[in-house]
Amino acid sequence: MIDTKHLDVAVQDLRNVLRDGLIATDIWDRTDGLSLAGFNAQPVAVALFTRITTELESSMADSNFPPLARYYLIDLAGNHTAAVLNHGSLLQGMLVDNKRANLGILISVAIPRMIDAIAKAR
């Protein structure tokens, strides 16, 4: 069982770390697409990244690549980055403004803290 209060605290911590560089984040169940916590929720992005992640996992397996591990990043136009974190049965998406948030902080602080926080919410 997931403790959604822990998820809410984790989202607030993420907002504190990335400040105004965090445009949006959602944490959702990858089976039904139900968002469990978030900031500036993006239901269309939840559906999109669930599909992309499923296709990516399938294609990597078919190509005999190692499976996805903790996360993947997508460099977007307008100096933005999308990060998708793999928490097993949960996925998390983040949209980050690279002009306002340092990518080093995203990769070395924000992502590891989210991974730890979601693990503790289980």
Residue ranges, per PLM feature:
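Non-catalytic interaction/Regulatory regions outside core domains
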Residues: 1-122
